[in-house]
């Protein structure tokens, strides 16, 4: 299922990109298309969170890794101008941590992300966009353990985020969306007061969904 979402998002992005490059017949505006200053865009996506995990210190020696997850995500974009938008992304997941000595348990991850976006071809039906911003990650419901002891972790981190996506308008208000984000996040871990090192999660987030313009 992970590969299916990635393949679907990649296919959608390529298809929409080809339509955009094809010219006026597919990408040009019409009275019922486009986004403009003051518009709100709300999207609901299915996303695959694919961590690029690596650990330092003991975590690195143990080969600590973080499993993929598929979850729903919702985001809200406000168009400050015809081309510039501000997006807030909301979603949460439960990720399992593994190591060379076996499963270490799971932890909840809540990573609200705020992005400044630039939307190309704002008056058209096919609208690529790019974004950059900041991510705050809250780690909660920590269920990590090793050797019969609980593993303590820092409960938050800050990091940058980058984004590329495409909206394809199908009616006056409804559009479909493909989106790829890279988010940097990490947490420090300890066991019995002894540092285990830092776990960098740094996921690639691939999503496919639908949206509505207000």
Residue ranges with predicted function:
Residues 1-36:
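Cleavable N-terminal export/targeting peptides
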Residues 23, 38, 82, 122-128, ...:
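Short coil turns and loop connectors of transmembrane beta-barrels in diderm outer membranes
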Residues 25-76, 141, 211-213:
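Short glycine/proline- and aromatic-enriched beta-strand/turn motifs that initiate or cap beta-hairpins
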Residues 28, 46-50, 75-146, 203-214:
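Gram-negative (and chloroplast) outer-membrane scaffold detector with strong preference
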Residues 38, 68-72, 106-112, 126, ...:
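Residues that define the transmembrane beta-barrel architecture of outer-membrane proteins
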Residues 54-60, 96-104, 140-150, 188-195:
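Outer-membrane beta-barrel translocator domains and adjoining extracellular loop/strand segments
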Residues 95, 171-214:
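Predominantly the C-terminal beta-signal and adjacent terminal strand-loop region
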Residues 111-116, 131-136, 155-166, 180-182:
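Hydrophobic alpha-helical segments of small multi-pass membrane proteins
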């Amino acid at each position: 299922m992970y590969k299916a979402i990635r393949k679907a998002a990649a296919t959608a992005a390529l298809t929409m990109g080809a339509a955009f490059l094809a010219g006026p017949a597919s990408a040009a505006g019409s009275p019922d298309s486009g986004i403009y200053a003051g518009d709100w865009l709300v999207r609901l996506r299915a996303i695959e969170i694919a961590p690029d995990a690596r650990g330092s210190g003991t975590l690195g020696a143990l080969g600590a890794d973080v499993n993929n997850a598929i979850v729903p995500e919702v985001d809200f974009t406000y168009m400050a101008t015809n081309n510039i938008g501000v997006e807030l992304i909301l979603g949460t997941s439960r990720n399992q941590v593994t190591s060379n000595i076996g499963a270490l348990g799971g932890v909840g991850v809540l990573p609200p992300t705020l992005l400044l976006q630039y939307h190309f071809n704002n008056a058209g039906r096919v609208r690529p966009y790019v974004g950059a911003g900041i991510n705050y990650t809250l780690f909660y419901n920590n269920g990590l353990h090793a050797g019969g002891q609980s593993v303590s972790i820092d409960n938050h981190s800050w990091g940058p985020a980058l984004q590329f996506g495409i909206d394809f308008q199908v009616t006056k208000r409804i559009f479909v969306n493909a989106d790829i984000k890279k988010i940097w996040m990490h947490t420090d871990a300890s066991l019995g007061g002894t540092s285990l090192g830092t776990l960098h999660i740094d996921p690639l987030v691939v999503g496919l969904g639908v949206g509505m313009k207000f």
